[in-house]
Amino acid sequence: MQQQHLFRFNILCLSLMTALPAYAENVQAGQAQEKQLDTIQVKAKKQKTRRDNEVTGLGKLVKSSDTLSKEQVLNIRDLTRYDPGIAVVEQGRGASSGYSIRGMDKNRVSLTVDGVSQIQSYTAQAALGGTRTAGSSGAINEIEYENVKAVEISKGSNSVEQGSGALAGSVAFQTKTADDVIGEGRQWGIQSKTAYSGKNRGLTQSIALAGRIGGAEALLIHTGRRAGEIRAHEDAGRGVQSFNRLVPVEDSSNYAYFIVKEECKNGSYETCKANPKKDVVGKDERQTVSTRDYTGPNRFLADPLSYESRSWLFRPGFRFENKRHYIGGILEHTQQTFDTRDMTVPAFLTKAVFDANKKQAGSLPGNGKYAGNHKYGGLFTNGENGALVGAEYGTGVFYDETHTKSRYGLEYVYTNADKDTWADYARLSYDRQGIGLDNHFQQTHCSADGSDKYCRPSADKPFSYYKSDRVIYGESHRLLQAAFKKSFDTAKIRHNLSVNLGFDRFGSNLRHQDYYYQHANRAYSSNTPPQNNGKKISPNGSETSPYWVTIGRGNVVTGQICRLGNNTYTDCTPRSINGKSYYAAVRDNVRLGRWADVGAGLRYDYRSTHSDDGSVSTGTHRTLSWNAGIVLKPTDWLDLTYRTSTGFRLPSFAEMYGWRAGVQSKAVKIDPEKSFNKEAGIVFKGDFGNLEASWFNNAYRDLIVRGYEAQIKDGKEEAKGDPAYLNAQSARITGINILGKIDWNGVWDKLPEGWYSTFAYNRVRVRDIKKRADRTDIQSHLFDAIQPSRYVVGLGYDQPEGKWGVNGMLTYSKAKEITELLGSRALLNGNSRNTKATARRTRPWYIVDVSGYYTVKKHFTLRAGVYNLLNYRYVTWENVRQTAGGAVNQHKNVGVYNRYAAPGRNYTFSLEMKF
């Protein structure tokens, strides 16, 4: 309905009408000087924002590829460097196990790429003894950041968007397309990036090629990386370190003489006994080496690491003439290797270890006796698997991990910029993804110092030893997804409706193989010398009557440790779990005029799993997730926000397989973990920038942990059945999050344009921890996953035309709260004992970083950064947490904590080229 505009004739109107002819005449007189100006069109690519999916944006962070470049993100640890409340979970062997958010980590924080879940952190039981706390890798595959267009980090329950795993938050990556490389108005694009990071001697080389011919287009990205371990502050590794090593010395006993028959040229005992040899015994000798070469629990430096990565991404496609329809494909292959040596394992035997093993083994024939002048050949003791190991060789423990990801898929995208049909946007995609983690443990005892990973026992190296153990874990997904978006108005209310559907066939497979040992022995016998003139000789080891022995070449013995069906770590029966899942989600973000925005979402998930192993806790799970949010806008400069959301995590494949204690376990019913998030915030915004402060409350229940069902018998609590993964814990946390960016020119226009400041703060407090009464032998939930409270303050300048810029960042972290590391364990007898996650916690620390960039002719950008500018000595909690009980591969028997020191002053450089 059109409104009628009434025209009222008055003195003012008459005056204007009278003046108009004269004005028109003047314009006509000057028309000869008029020029038609060209039409200027300004186009900008749509950037992902915090409020794209959820109206409040509370708890969300969005980073574009440009942001990643500016922050010099070269690996997973750089991604959240300046984002308090989000931390990387160290896997313990150079890799990572995802992120920790709001007290939860690993599989409780969802990780997806284009909606496809990445591999779970699968921790298998470890072999008894040794240094390992997990038999498998426990890592989560890392993402190639040069392939990333944008990343959205959500803190708080987020299953309505990301499904299972988003119990405490989610990290969602979006892959680049050809448009991200091809410049506006061009038909092709080339991007190259060369970067070096001093903290780990990391080198990155990436090149992206994209082109468009007619409707056809394609993108190709290749990235290679090579790096070492993250080096600690130089002060942590200064000096030298000493250790004891067992060396051979002559036995002082009067009855320790012998003759080797093979060394007696004429074979006559009587002739050769005039020059007998003396037995050897072990004695500790103090030796000194550099801190880099030292092995043992008191090692100052981190374990050496060799890291390599190769990634290919290929995205071909065809865009139809009207540009509404697009059909494309994606092929991705990424392989990363993490090869490390555990140098906390002493390379050399000591007298204490030698004597203890020898005592345990009893009498060892030939001990102390050697051939030739090779005195070390007489020092050997009992080792693993009944093998004898010599003091001559050093021990090396190596972990070689290879992470391989392969993905290919098809997609159809419909985009309607005119918004005049049933959908503004629709996407139908099919992805087939396989991710495998190959974890190979090797223990060598066949080289001089233990550093040779490739040495093997041989007949000419008696008492040498080798052990291999390999666990290969893989997951596969065949995922079909559909997404629809539509904006429309009803009664002056703007709706932004989206519908998401998905169906997945998945599989999990763990193979335990190459589990064997090899050892080299020697031929030895103690003989009776031939009679002398018919007289029997009985040697007693004295100088005049030495022993008469034979020492010959031995052989190599190989023994298999793998067993089938014994339900312990040595069981090498393949583990397989398969299943299907589907989901349906709907979300509507509504704009109620200029005063308020309201949003709500609902999602239904279904998962069914099965296995050939009857002990696996498979089954069917149905879950419903939702969220709701509101933004009140009383003024142009103030927003009041509030949101609630739920999250869930279905039992992981490792939890479904269960804990095997040598008996045939029974399958148990495991319910999904659940979470409920409440969050309220206030946002100040304007020409000055924006500042947001929020308070959150996260409650977790039915947390899954290993333990027993409890029962009361004769008035006492006792365990029922076998150990299993059970729903047993609940917890609640609260916290504060502050985020802001200030444009100083907007605050005061006298200041130059381009100056800005940033501020971020996060604090979490544990409010409640409970254990179910019908569970026992349960460890209370320890919040070692909480990052200590942290402030990040920045001051920067970007030249208005984007030619150059500089930025300084101050990061201050508080100490790790001791209360977050203390807990109790419910014992089988009904009592409990106090526990502690780890023996150490970190102190407060601060660092200053400075970075900048300079662009030459719009094609070349040089970036540089100085991190820990003041060369401050500090230790992060994320590093020390590797010694905590909740660590994936817990570091045990740590003597000194220098090895966890953060890098000192270090530099990063990169050169970007765009054409």
UniProtKB/Swiss-Prot annotation:
A motif (TonB box) lies at residues 38-45. Residues 351-361 are annotated as: L3 helix finger, interacts with transferrin. GO terms for molecular function: ferric iron transmembrane transporter activity; siderophore uptake transmembrane transporter activity. It is found in: Cell outer membrane. The N-terminal periplasmic domain encodes a plug that inserts into the 22 beta-strand barrel, the extracellular loops extend up to 60 Angstroms away from the outer membrane. Part of the plug (the plug loop, resides 121-139) interacts with transferrin (TF), as does the L3 helix finger in extracellular loop 3 (residues 351-361). When the L3 helix finger inserts into TF it disturbs the conformation of TF and its coordination of iron 2. Belongs to the TonB-dependent receptor family. This is Transferrin-binding protein A. The lineage of its organism: Bacteria, Pseudomonadati, Pseudomonadota, Betaproteobacteria, Neisseriales.
